[in-house]
Amino acid sequence: MSKGILGKKVGMTQVFAENGDVIPVTVIEAAPNVVLQKKTVDSDGYEAVQLGFDDQKQNNANKPEKGHAAKAETAPKRFIKEIRGVNLDEFEVGQEIKVDAFAEGDIVDVTGTSKGKGFAGAIKRHNQARGPMSHGSRYHRRPGSMGPVDPNRVFKGKALPGRMGGEQVTVQNLEIIKVDAERNLLLVKGNVPGAKKSYVTVRSAIKSK
């Protein structure tokens, strides 16, 4: 069955394997999550468990958020996500989920919000090739052709300049190098999306071999 936990990206560092290899890792702080709700086929049409992470000030939460958290006897949460594909019998509302749910060697998918880059051109945003920079060329870093004359419009999806980043990104099949239960830390091999202190979701990999 699938497993999942919510956390906050701390940053990157490196650890040494037993054979001396250097492994780049991302540190994810995953303080105990609280099960806020169990969704069933009868009531919601699908099965999932709703987790909450990072307490929110009571003054910043509205009345529905406070009432939803009160059912689990906890404080309102800043970050709430659902994890599907789990065995609902293993969860109870108000239960805490800790990092020891995962083990070293587990393969996971990590979802986060990519760093915002602001308004970017087609070369940076879509890896488009630039034009010649000399020999009389007047086409350097522009978007290029908008398409043929006949449709008399620009097709959806045309690679054009625009706001880059700030999107949901999932990096798949990352290995958990270490689980630090005392400090509520997960060390994941490689990089994960987002800036430092941004929220991430760690789930069991769906395409792992």
Curated annotation (Swiss-Prot):
* Alphabetic keyword roster: Ribonucleoprotein, Ribosomal protein, RNA-binding, rRNA-binding
Q: Does the keyword RNA-binding apply?
A: yes
Gene Ontology BP, a term: translation
- What Pfam families does the record tag this protein with? Ribosomal_L3
- The keyword Ion transport belongs to this UniProt entry's keyword annotation: no
**An example molecular function term from Gene Ontology annotations:** rRNA binding
Q: Which domain of life is it from?
A: Bacteria
A cellular component term, taken from the record's GO annotations: cytosolic large ribosomal subunit
Q: Where is this region: Disordered?
A: 128-152
Matching InterPro entries: Ribosomal_uL3, Ribosomal_uL3_bac/org-type, Ribosomal_uL3_CS, Transl_B-barrel_sf
Subunit organization:
Part of the 50S ribosomal subunit. Forms a cluster with proteins L14 and L19.
HAMAP family registered for this protein in UniProt: Ribosomal_uL3_B (MF_01325_B)
Function summary: One of the primary rRNA binding proteins, it binds directly near the 3'-end of the 23S rRNA, where it nucleates assembly of the 50S subunit.
**What family is this protein classified in?**
Belongs to the universal ribosomal protein uL3 family.
Q: What is this protein called?
A: Large ribosomal subunit protein uL3
Native source organism of the sequence: Halalkalibacterium halodurans (strain ATCC BAA-125 / DSM 18197 / FERM 7344 / JCM 9153 / C-125)
The organism that produces this protein has a lineage beginning with: Bacteria, Bacillati, Bacillota, Bacilli, Bacillales
User: Which gene is the coding source of this polypeptide chain?
Assistant: rplC
